[in-house]
């Protein structure tokens, strides 16, 4: 009699706070599509986290649907992956509150993203912005995730999640699986085209610093032509001394499959103009089918609705079991 090997489970998500960036695609979504055969994958539109910063309601709804379409267009098969909207699974809020009560003030105070977002949103430093690591821990622990795909700058979130889970398990006995960060080696952190010392972000003050997944080809090319390099005029990977060129090399490597050595040889003796044009063209061609398929999917709202409704049902079956277990452990009276 054959025994079925239980797949390890992965949970990740992106806030639908605007257009998905090239950094989101190369650093996360592109890698997710290849994981479904090996892992049990759950991917969410993290809309509850999004409202820690004020949103225009109609834009949030549109961005959430567009993000779902982009997930599917990027190769996330809804049959193989559980795709869902965070707010459609009430267990996230339920577990998030319980974990708030097992998360220390000092832990939250040390979170670097709270400091960064507080500085950028000084007129709206709300409690949700402060406690969102506890909600994020709930997102992960609800599904008893083994692995959490994150960028190198997000390891702190997995670390506090592990601390919270270990604390809860220490008090009540084994309840949560302790997750590990899953960090891809290439494309894990795409930097701004205009400030390569900073991560590419939709909140970049210079609009030319960020490329979007669904952007028009001519706009993508324009941004790459303006990308910051240096005065050396030599395509060589050196992250410390040539951050702009190294960032472009990393983008080109991921979009073409070429090694850094092959890229250096390809552009030996050629100027940065040729190099930036080639990087831009490779990104345009990589994103073209995704943009076209996203547009096609957005024209079929009924199909997308079936996907997010089914995803919420599948996610809730797992999440509700965890919440029931946690409620019993902390002493809540069963309904």
Language-model regions, residue ranges each:
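N-terminal Rossmann-like or analogous alpha/beta NTP/dinucleotide-binding catalytic cores
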Residues: 2-138, 282-285, 295
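Short, histidine-centered active-site or binding-site loop motifs used for metal coordination
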Residues: 14-16, 47-49, 146-147, 204, ...
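Short, polar/flexible loop-turn hinges at active-site or ligand-entry regions and domain interfaces
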Residues: 56-57, 148-151, 235
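Short catalytic-loop micro-motif centered on adjacent basic/acidic residues
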Residues: 82-85, 149, 232
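Short helix-capping/linker segments at secondary-structure and domain boundaries
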Residues: 105-109, 142-149, 253-263
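Internal, conserved structured core segments that host functional sites
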Residues: 116-168, 172, 192
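Conserved nucleotide- and phosphate/pyrophosphate-binding catalytic cores
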Residues: 156, 162-335
């Amino acid at each position: 009699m054959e025994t079925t090997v239980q797949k390890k489970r992965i949970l990740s998500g992106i806030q639908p706070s605007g257009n998905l960036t090239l950094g989101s695609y190369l650093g996360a979504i592109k890698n997710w599509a290849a994981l479904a055969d090996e892992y049990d994958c759950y991917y969410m539109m993290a809309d509850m986290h999004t409202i820690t910063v004020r949103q225009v309601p109609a834009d949030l709804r549109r961005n959430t649907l567009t993000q779902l379409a982009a997930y599917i267009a990027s190769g996330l098969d809804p049959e193989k992956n559980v795709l869902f909207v965070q707010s459609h699974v009430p267990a996230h809020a339920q577990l998030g509150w319980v974990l708030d009560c097992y998360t220390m003030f000092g832990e939250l105070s040390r979170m670097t993203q709270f400091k960064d977002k507080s500085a950028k949103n000084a007129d709206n430093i709300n409690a949700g912005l402060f406690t969102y690591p506890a909600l994020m821990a709930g997102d992960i622990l609800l599904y008893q995730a083994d692995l959490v795909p994150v960028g190198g700058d997000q390891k702190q979130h997995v670390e506090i999640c592990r601390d919270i889970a270990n604390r809860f398990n220490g008090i009540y006995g084994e309840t949560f699986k302790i997750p590990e960060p899953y960090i891809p080696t290439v494309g894990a952190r795409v930097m701004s085209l205009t400030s390569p010392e900073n991560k590419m972000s939709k909140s970049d003050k210079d609009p030319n610093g960020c490329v979007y997944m669904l952007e028009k080809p001519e706009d993508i090319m324009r941004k790459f032509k303006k990308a910051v390099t240096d005065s050396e005029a030599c395509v060589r990977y050196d992250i410390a001394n040539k951050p702009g060129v190294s960032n472009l090399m990393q983008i080109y490597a991921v979009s073409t499959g070429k090694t850094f050595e092959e890229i250096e040889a390809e552009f030996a003796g050629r100027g940065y103009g040729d190099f930036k044009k080639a990087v831009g063209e490779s990104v345009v061609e990589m994103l073209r089918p995704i943009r076209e398929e996203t547009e096609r999917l957005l024209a079929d709202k009924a199909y997308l609705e079936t996907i997010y409704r089914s995803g919420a049902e599948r996610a809730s079956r797992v999440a509700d079991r965890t919440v029931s277990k946690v409620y019993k452990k902390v002493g809540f009276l069963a309904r």
